[in-house]
């Protein structure tokens, strides 16, 4: 029984995001594995209790309760998880699973281990306590958000309530981590998080499933040539995703090193606060925020680029980076969280310190100016990533993990 942050392949509700779709990719990978009957529960406003599609039982959980209750949840007067967990218990009673697989320790569903006797495994994604520690880049604070609201009371309310909700969810995740007895992950960083909060719990390795758009054997990166440096990044909105580092690095590349630059940033369509704080306008140094895009659009942009750049201040195992590796693209990434478990520094790409635009700019320039080295790094990254994310391997690993822990039911 999966408890997912997205509807996965249910109906037409597959999440569209610059680097998303990983739950749907795993569902495709698992396919019709013998001996596995799959149920998937997720938050979605839908009148049906359950629906069966292609042999999978989907449970859309509609937790959008009365407006007064929603306001209380926003203000922190009632738990945002209570209504969701009550509905989740009903799903468990109906499906009667041998094992519960929760995607993400930050989910309310991780607290089901306190409400059910069914073995529960948390599939580590990010980790909000760690993200809370790094959520403001150097030089940023809550006051920057206050100023960005421009005196708009509604914007101010949303900012404050969202920040409080983030911190509440981080505390809730700590409770889920402490009570969980089984974890699954893929980096030394998420293994460490699990061990800190639940030192006696089991931990199993399973790589992340990637979108099939990136596994086309005929699509292999080669250095594009030319003088202009072409870069691609995929981000989301939080400040800790590093849009400010992109702007600072782009300024150095364009105005200090003197290189022509084309840096496509997918997943966000603006970074006004970061532009104001850094004093760097994206358009003045070749940065274009492209917004959310389809996987094929990002894939084609990667194949035409010189380097994939990942600038986060904290991360676990960004699928966007792995997708670039599968295509054979060299990467430059900040050495944070679980990234060092994905990139062998100097072999598949380069790792640089967080918030170091100088080293990032230099590594990008090195790869551009040495296409044979870039080609070798890309080839190494492709071999590593295609083995790591091979669907058959993931399917076998996941089935073995399920069999191992479902036996605990007795």
Task: Write out the residue ranges for each language-model feature.
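Aromatic "clamp/platform" in nucleotide-sugar-dependent glycosyltransferases that forms part
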Residues: 313
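N-terminal subdomain of nucleotide-sugar transferases
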Residues: 1-47, 251
